[in-house]
A protein has these predicted regions:
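Amphipathic alpha-helical packing segments from all-alpha helical-bundle domains
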Residues: 66-67, 97-107, 114-141, 148-151, ...
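N-terminal intrinsically disordered/low-complexity leader segments
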Residues: 1-6, 191-192
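Hydrophobic/aromatic-rich alpha-helical bundle segments in the mid-to-C-terminal region
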Residues: 119-120, 124, 138-192
Length: 192
């Protein structure tokens, strides 16, 4: 297997774009080669098979949507409060809007995981770990709310992102409403 990290990242980024635009059925090693504009067979030099490619796509999407450490440090320099939670929720949503193909690819991976039990188990492990990381981050930062509040925020933001990606008209009547602020106010008390 080839080990050029820049080429691997470029292939994974191309794979994310293919998965987002063509769906799981359109994701082939050859399609990734075409999207990455590399010679046919390049992708197969980096990934043994489609299953390995799918798992590495999951890892790459996580890298792409994770905030830069400097940005996160700036955000977290504020006092723990409901307002800080709202800011963090907005930033998650902004990252989704800035990298829509990454989120669409994650949705496609989730759907593929329902059809392929081995992949589904691996994705379940990854997403469970990510949720636990989010809970731990929230609690360690002293933000208001408990573990269940964090899970509810996680579910609400994922639902909002899903609608924004797939049926943006659903939330159109609420454009003037700050849904993130409403979420935080209804779920989190300042003294929790």
């Amino acid at each position: 297997m080839r080990q050029n990290p820049e080429r691997r990242a470029a292939l994974l980024d191309a794979a994310i774009d293919v998965l987002a635009s063509e769906g799981s059925r359109g994701l082939t090693l050859r399609a990734v080669d075409g999207k990455a504009q590399v010679p046919i067979g390049t992708c197969s030099n980096y990934f043994r098979n489609r299953d390995e490619l799918l798992l590495q796509i999951m890892e790459r999407t996580h890298e792409r949507i994770t905030p830069e450490p400097e940005q996160l440090a700036r955000t977290m320099s504020a006092e723990p409060s409901r307002s800080l939670v709202v800011l963090l929720l907005r930033q998650v949503h902004e990252r989704m809007q800035d990298d829509r193909s990454c989120y669409l690819a994650m949705l496609e991976l989730r759907l593929e995981g329902t059809r392929r039990p081995a992949l589904g188990k691996q994705l379940n492990d990854i997403f469970s770990s990510v949720l636990e990381e989010n809970i731990r981050f929230h609690m360690d930062a002293g933000l208001p709310g408990d573990r269940i509040d964090v899970v509810l925020l996680y579910l609400a933001v994922h639902g909002m992102n899903l609608d924004d990606l797939t049926a943006p008209g659903v939330l159109a009547p609420y454009v003037g409403t700050d849904l993130f602020d409403e979420l935080a106010q209804r779920l989190l008390s300042e003294d929790s």
